[in-house]
Amino acid sequence: MKLTPHSREWYARLARELGGYRHPWTRVLDGPDPELTFDALLAERLGPGVRVLEAGCGHGPDAARFGAQTARWVAYDRQPELLALARDNAPHAEFCLWDGRGAVPDALRGPFDLIVSRRGPTGVIGHLPAVAAPGGRFLYVGPTLEVPQVPERLVAVGWTIHGEWRVSVRAWTPRWEDWVTRCEWMGEEARQEDWETRATARGLPYQEERYVVLAGAE
């Protein structure tokens, strides 16, 4: 049965078949991973006294990689199958099942010095005034060069953008099946004509894009 991309059932299948929230297509990058900007900004803001809230943690790769460098790493996701993997991958972190709607659960109230989201839900922005400590920061990376709801929602809660980065790296999908899967993931149309006219021995080129933003209440 074909599942709707980004539906709960679709994420459950990713957890079951891929062991986490991972790109289900093969890609080859011509340069550094565009998410390295987010990684660098995150790493330089961690420390033994820093309390972190992660929105949309998936199977917990960031909690596993960075959590031990903090005073507390708390994360939430709406998908129970992914949270089960996250708890195994990062036993030192705290995880909560939540879809970002309604009142913030007590376990997520913080306060937190850093709120992060790696291609996760932007709805967390509406909760920043409730969960952020004085001087807290919000760090986000999205899957395209423009994610207009992020600056719009930051303005709505009175937060200021301190920095924006747009990174684009050429990538290749080596097979037609990879291109179809990538387009489904991104909500784009996979056209056979594009493959037939533009694909080379390396596959079809496209731009792997990221939008990174750092914001604060002042």
Model segments located where?
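Short "lid" loop at the C-terminus of a central beta-strand within the Rossmann-like core
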Residues: 122, 143-148, 166-171
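Conserved class I S-adenosyl-L-methionine
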Residues: 1-47, 49-58, 139-159
